[in-house]
From Swiss-Prot:
UniProt-listed Enzyme Commission number(s): 2.4.1.18
SMART domains the record matches: Aamy
Highest classification ranks of the organism: Bacteria, Pseudomonadati, Pseudomonadota, Gammaproteobacteria, Methylococcales
Protein name per UniProt: 1,4-alpha-glucan branching enzyme GlgB
Catalysed reactions listed for this entry: Transfers a segment of a (1->4)-alpha-D-glucan chain to a primary hydroxy group in a similar glucan chain
Length: 740
């Protein structure tokens, strides 16, 4: 260690090197021209002796410091020379001096990043294999404008922040260093010294592609992937996929608790791919939505407290293992949507919080920068580099992993400055309102760029308020999302279904109110993970009554969901009526499928999926009023509703009975004077029902409900039926029930 008197004798540059606080170590270290000779200088705190070349000149120690220097002949010394140094144990080490290499990042890269519009920023910042003058190594770069000094530390330098200080690139706030001969697989972090206070922070790489398995937090140098994709046909078709008018049935799942291995551990992405895809295909879903697999430190956060925005979590394997997962889904006709969290981030010391000793990614004022309910921090969307970080993350997952969509979490918390805040605990925008103008601009940029760069990819908002035009184009004043979750419908229908059927006629409006706004947005109907946790009970547990009634209620609820306007989303376990709440620490309760009732619900969901996807009237106009018309929305006394779903050329009739009372001789008006037949009945025996229903139904010229013709039906209790005009049509595998 250099004493204070010696330090005082050094030049300011030398002092800053010795104290590990120099912003431009290249000004001191490396190769410098002196007259007709070159001066080589290095800083090696553990060295006893240093040579240039294995048999070259011994470098002189400067004033008792760990700075070594010597003069060499320029013509006889390699441009990128190798230094050999001996430590206190007598062991010799060697390395090519990193301070002989010029800056690698282009001014244009830095300009675009400063403007917040570098769509490939993940290829610039972070740690990347790189070659300079035929020498392979790793180029490190990070953004920390308020740092006095940043060093790359890792197992390659004993985690010593004095060994590899980086250079700052002007006013950009970006720091970089090329370290020769490093290999992928090594652990690293950034050691950051704050300019104002001199505090030192050890941080994971915000752009890291892979991380240690928690609880460890180091980033891992990764090589550029050589994964050979096999989904070219899928991607080509996706570009022209008319998703507005196509069926979308999403299976939401948590990769860590869908299934476990024999020892109770996590499945690898590759093993999960095979088991999950086979199951999802058999159940008839079109897409899988993964709860966040971005790297995160806390299992109990379910992935929603992200620290690695460019890395699949190491819990389930490597980045290439995740590529295999997506590839296998695509080769089997299954799309993949990722739950992505740009609304907030955790306070973990190794993460983004106060990254350079200041509120860099977040706001300094907690009234803007903190979610106190969640214990997390809020991004500063008005800062170009922060916006670019998030946009780069979204584009990274779509480009590198071929994902088919992003579900954007907690959008409402981004839109409102007063979200979950008391009066006086938030700061109005410049117009005095509660709208977060910077977040709105970010979301519009996100949707615009994603749709431009990746046609056919979906961006879906979890947005729980009445914010207008969430799914309308940005050029008309909308936010530009493809779809949004219909939280209002979900809430109303679950409240209704929780009522004892004897009381439901008092709450009939909760069945029908949703149609007043059903076509104001492009809605997804979600029964998500949020509805089966925190004491809310499982979907089955929400249903009233004894065992028969609970299962029948759930079957009619799912029938309504799959025939109601909007795309579909169902959380794992709900498809077979799991009895308990979801628990992220264990697998789903798969033994329940040994029960005929639970197996029947899975059969019902599978048949509803196939009916939905094979019946264009049920999906072609999910987002337009021409695809829906009421037959009768007013039969509150009997808790029955009926409606028509249409496309341009066909229609189906849906009748739902929400009481445990069979309705015989129940007449409804129908659109056309043709025969009808049941193509679906949730009371079918194979679903666990009593097999009460209708065979071919004759239309009568009896005016009813304002229609010229009508039919007389038998409505099974707590059940829904779907009728189609007599023609070849989809029929459940177990057959259509008949009158008894």
């Amino acid at each position: 260690m250099t004493d204070s008197s010696t330090l005082a004798e050094l030049s300011p540059d030398f002092q800053r090197i010795v104290e590990a606080r120099h912003h431009d170590p290249f000004a001191v270290l490396g190769r410098h021209r002196r007259d007709n000779r070159d001066l080589i200088r290095a800083f090696l705190p553990q060295a006893e002796e240093v040579r240039v070349g294995s048999a070259g000149r011994v470098m002189e120690r400067i004033a008792g410091t760990a700075i070594f220097e010597c003069e060499v002949e320029a013509e006889t010394t390699d441009l990128h020379y190798r230094l050999y140094w001996t430590d206190q144990t007598g062991q010799t080490h060697s390395f090519i001096d990193p301070y002989t290499f010029p800056p690698r990042l282009s001014d244009f890269d830095l300009y675009l990043f400063g403007e917040g519009r570098h769509w490939n920023i993940y290829r610039v910042l972070g740690a990347h294999p790189h070659s300079v003058d035929g020498i392979d190594g790793i180029l490190f770069a990070t953004w920390a404008p308020n740092a006095e000094r940043i060093s790359v530390v890792g197992e390659f330098n004993g985690w010593d922040g004095r060994r590899h200080p980086m250079r700052v690139r002007g006013a950009s706030g970006v720091w970089e260093l090329f370290i020769p001969e490093l290999q992928p697989g090594l652990l690293y972090k950034f050691e950051i010294r704050n300019r104002a206070h001199g505090t030192i922070h050890l941080k994971s790489d915000p752009y890291g592609r892979q991380f240690e398995l928690r609880p460890n937090t180091a980033s891992i140098i990764t090589r550029e992937s050589g994964y050979a994709w096999n989904d070219a046909d899928w991607l080509a078709q996706r570009k022209d996929w008319p998703w507005l008018h196509r069926p979308l049935s999403v299976y939401e799942m948590h990769a860590g608790s869908w299934k476990r291995d024999l020892e109770g551990g996590y499945l690898n992405y590759r093993d999960l791919a095979h088991e999950l895809v086979d199951y999802v295909k058999s159940a008839g879903f079109s897409h899988i939505e993964l709860m966040p697999v971005t790297e995160h430190p806390l299992d109990a956060s379910w992935g929603y407290q992200t620290t690695g925005y460019f890395a699949p979590t190491s819990r389930f394997g490597t980045p290439d293992d995740f590529r295999y997962f997506v590839d296998h889904c695509h080769r089997n006709g299954i799309g993949v949507i990722l739950d992505w969290v740009p609304a907030h981030f955790p306070k973990d010391a190794h993460g983004l919080a106060r990254f350079d000793g200041t509120a860099l990614y977040e706001h300094e004022d907690p009234r803007l920068g903190e979610h106190r309910d969640w214990g997390t921090l809020i991004y500063n969307y008005g800062r170009n580099e922060v916006k670019n970080f998030l946009l780069g993350s979204a584009l990274f997952w779509l480009e590198e992993f071929h994902l088919d969509g992003l579900r954007v979490d907690a959008v409402a918390s981004m839109l409102y400055l007063d979200y979950s805040r008391q009066p006086g605990d938030w700061i109005p925008n410049k117009y005095g309102g509660n709208e977060n103008l910077e977040a709105i601009a970010f979301l519009r940029d996100l949707n615009t760029v994603v749709h431009q760069q990746f046609p056919g990819v979906l961006v879906i908002a979890e947005e729980s308020t009445a914010w207008p035009q969430v799914t309308r184009p940005t050029w008309t004043g909308g936010l530009g999302f493809s779809m949004k979750w219909n939280m209002g419908w979900m809430h109303d229908i679950l409240v209704y279904m929780g009522k004892d059927p004897v009381h439901r006629h008092y709450h009939h409006d909760q069945l029908t109110f949703g149609l007043l706004y059903a076509f104001t947005e492009n809605f997804v109907l979600p029964f998500s993970h949020d509805e089966v946790v925190h004491g809310k009970g499982s979907m089955l547990a929400k249903m009233p009554g004894d065992e028969w009634r609970r299962f029948a209620n759930l079957r009619v609820l799912y029938t309504m969901m799959f025939t109601y306007p909007g795309k579909k989303l169902l959380f794992m376990g709900c498809e077979f009526a799991q009895t308990g709440e979801w628990n992220h620490t264990t697998a789903l309760d798969w033994p329940l499928l040994e029960s005929n009732l639970h197996k029947g619900v899975l059969h019902l969901v599978s048949d509803l999926n196939r009916l939905y996807q094979s019946t264009s009237a049920l999906y072609a106009y999910d987002f337009e009023s021409q695809g829906f018309e009421w037959i009768d929305s007013h039969d509150a006394a009997q808790s029955v509703i009926s409606y028509v779903r249409r496309d341009d050329d066909s229609h189906v009739v849906v009748v739902l009975n929400f009481t445990p009372v069979p309705r015989h001789n129940y007449r409804i008006g129908v659109p056309e004077p043709v025969g009808y037949r049941e193509v679906f009945n949730s009371d079918a025996e194979c679903y666990g029902g009593a097999n009460l229903g209708n065979w071919e139904i004759k239309t009568e010229s009896v005016e009813w409900m304002g229609r010229a013709q009508s039919v007389v039906l038998t409505l099974p209790p707590l059940a829904g039926i779907v009728l189609a005009p007599v023609a070849p049509s989809a029929t459940p595998d177990c057959g259509t029930p008949g009158d008894e």
